[in-house]
Amino acid sequence: MKKILKSSKSRTILLSALLIGAVPTMNVALADLTATKYPAAETYKPTPIPDRIILSWKGDTATTQAVSWRTDVNVVTPQAQIAVAEDGPAFKAKAKTVMAESSSEVKGNQPYTAKFHTVNFENLNPSTKYLYRVGDGVNWSEWFEFSTASDKSEPFSFLYVGDAQNDILEHWSRVIRNAYSDLPDAKFIIHAGDLINHGDADEQWGEWFKAGGWLNGMVSSIPTPGNHEYSKIVKGEPSGLSQYWRPQFALPENGPTGFEETVYYTDYQGMRIISLDTNVKGSNLDKQVAWLEQVLENNPNKWTVITFHHPIYANSPGRDNVEVRNKLLPLIEKYSVDLVLQGHDHSYARGHVTNKASGQNAMSTKSDTVFVVSVSGPKMYDFTSKNWDENGAQVRNAIKDTQLYQLVRVNGDTLSYEARTATGNLFDGFEINKTPSGQKQIKETTNTQWEKEKQEEKNAKN
């Protein structure tokens, strides 16, 4: 036995030596090889198999649910199946088939044309979990799950992210995935514009959908358009909303005429979420302002959030969205909007209107609005509070060169907010508490990364 073990050991040592001796030769051979980038035209080419599946809402969040997806142009029977979720596979026999209500062909910058389809599930039951899949009757996606909203004001949570825009698959994917990991019960995601860099670049939309993956098919999206969702800007006016926008996002058409699926509102369990298009100016912005006043005046919800791309108070040096601020801020203050969620400036800041003599300001017990600018992608700009300071606003927390995501939880009279860095560190946070009369008190979150850094700076000076 000892001889056998010794012999085996000898052979092992000899084999190891041979392998080690072979390594340099293998490395030389590998070094001579050159990798070739796989073409985007092949990576993102559509097929009969559904992809880019995404949930959104066109109507009542308690009784409807929209889903959009992409195939090649040869699919002529786009459809979806839906059933109340069960613990076993028997639900499939009970699934109802719904034919797509719309299909649109889109030809972007790649040498192929794709077809986008939309189904709007209707007459659903509130507070109910459903399973669905999309396809053509033969080629199907996997089964996805979603839950309808309650028809009452019950607790819920959602995610908010700023610009993804550049190097989306490489750098943004971890952010959106970590966000969901931190808030797996999120009911929707607000995207504050510039989801991509070039509105008609199919490979960029392909990266965006791939980064979110199955999450898009289970959690509804509420997107607002940024300047990069437009083909170009001519004399301050956008020209050509991305041809992908409406085919792939099925959104409410309750906004002013001419702003279908870019200016709209959605009600969810006691909160009204409003999307505005700040890419337009002049009379086109005036139309939105008139519509916005009606939507705010006739608002039965306890909470109100507005999202648009260009900030009321700019973070970036040299930027100043004067018309947006002059036309929107009076209504925001008049109707005590709770949160204004923005993007565009590729840094983070959170603040409020500076204390006024009357006490009507965002940090008093009577007034309210918290303004946030954030970024989730890798494109970064410098930060300055100059535009905030010069226009009667105060920055509470700010950071540059950092990707972030935001978690918002709503429970009755309390809204809590967290801004976390890409790796999950708590950078900023606050809580809004409302009294029955509508007055608000804002409590800053303690023990954040921002607080720790400020304390370290203070200690270093001492």
Question: Over which residues does each language-model region extend?
Answer:
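Active-site-proximal segments of metal-dependent phosphoesterases and phosphodiesterases across multiple
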Residues: 299-342
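The substrate-binding groove and active-site-proximal loops of carbohydrate-active enzymes
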Residues: 161-167, 192-204, 233-234, 275-285, ...
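An acidic-aromatic substrate-binding cleft motif
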Residues: 139-192, 197-198
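Extended active-site neighborhood of metal-dependent phosphoesterases/phosphodiesterases
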Residues: 115-121, 129-145, 203-300, 327, ...
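Non-catalytic positions within long, well-ordered alpha-helices that form the structural scaffold/packing
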Residues: 180-182, 297, 333
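Alpha/beta-hydrolase fold active-site loops
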Residues: 155-157, 187-188, 263, 270-271, ...
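Acidic, histidine-bearing metal-coordination/catalytic regions of metal-dependent phosphoesterases
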Residues: 2, 11-160, 181, 401, ...
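Active-site neighborhood of phospho(di)ester-bond hydrolases with catalytic His/Asp-centered motifs
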Residues: 160-162, 188-194, 221-227, 276-277, ...
